[in-house]
Design a protein with these regions (language model features):
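Flavin-dependent oxidoreductase catalytic cores
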Residues: 1-310
């Protein structure tokens, strides 16, 4: 079981999310109970060309002890270089290969889910990563490019043969992006047909979603993306936190942001998180709208404290 192999406290993982899974958010999710937290998705080619902005995304903090990295790319020699670079220069728990990203720019370049259109190349990419690290390696992929080319089972079996440590299946095709419903029957089928740990991904927004889907599919864990982004308390024993706890977490998150970014950027980036944190609370729309107009930290904290004490 990958949870024991990596010495983790949970089989609920935080997925890589561009513009979201920075150090402050990873610290928050880790403290709330996430077993593993991913950096934002990293371009292997950008590492090869020594791109400073990309390398900045690899920064970690001593308060993190459960951080992993996900890379994307389609050239085995570039993947091999990036894997060696990450292994030799950082202290990540594991390396994940993205073969599921549906974004047009990624797909057009032959990366992400485009690799599901060439399983021979996908195999070469996985082998290049495995052969250049002693860290656990995982692969994340989708059902296939579209409903007529669902080859996730073949890719899962390739991963098994190459002794990948675990795999994650997002139960949608590339064509679906994030529309429609994730079909967990495919995750169940994959679990039944490969002898390596399988994590499920797709449409887990509550603890009940997680419980139901894990029980149905018998998967080994869940990778949480939008569900965690919108409610990081999903990692804790009780996802239904009271208003006081949520606002205290917002303020802690803001203070963490201020450690890593200048104040203006921290405030702007926290706006989206505040929208998610306060979702569902009575009268929260008024508070969220007010905060969206503010650029002064003390004013923001004042409004949050007033809302907490209502």
């Amino acid at each position: 079981m990958i949870k024991e192999k990596l010495n983790l406290n949970s089989n609920l993982f935080l997925a890589p999310l561009a513009g979201v899974t920075d150090i402050p958010f990873r610290i928050i999710c880790g403290e709330l109970g996430a077993g593993l937290c991913f950096t934002e998705m990293i371009s292997a080619k950008a590492l090869y060309y020594d791109d400073k902005k990309t390398k900045k995304l690899l920064d970690t903090d001593p308060r993190e002890n459960n951080t992993s990295v996900q890379i994307f790319g389609h050239e085995p020699e570039i993947i091999a270089y990036a894997t060696r670079f990450l292994t030799e220069n950082y202290n990540f728990k594991s390396i994940d290969i993205n073969m599921g990203c549906p974004a047009p720019k990624i797909f057009k370049n032959g990366d992400g889910s485009a690799l599901m259109g060439d399983l021979n190349l996908a195999e070469d990419v996985i082998r290049a990563c495995k052969n250049n690290t002693d860290l656990p390696v995982s692969v994340k992929f989708r059902l296939g490019i579209d409903e007529n080319s669902m080859n996730y089972m073949q890719l899962g079996q390739i991963c098994e043969r190459l002794k990948v440590d675990y795999i994650t299946l997002h139960a949608r095709t590339r064509k679906m992006f994030y529309s429609g419903e994730a079909d967990w029957s495919h995750i169940k089928r994959l679990v039944e047909n490969v002898d390596i740990p399988v994590f499920g991904n797709g449409d887990c927004f509550t603890k009940e979603d997680i419980r139901k889907n894990m029980e149905y599919s018998n998967c080994d864990g869940v990778l949480l993306a939008r569900g965690a982004m919108q409610n990081p308390f999903i990692f804790s024993d009780d996802e239904n936190k009271n208003k006081e706890e949520v606002i205290d977490t917002i303020k802690k998150h803001m203070q963490l942001k201020l450690e890593f970014y200048e104040e203006k950027r921290a405030i702007l980036e926290m706006r989206k998180h505040i929208q998610w944190y306060l979702k569902g609370f009575r009268n929260s729309n008024k508070v969220k709208n007010e905060i969206n107009q503010l650029t002064d930290l003390n004013e923001i904290f004042k409004i949050l404290d007033e809302f907490k004490n209502e």
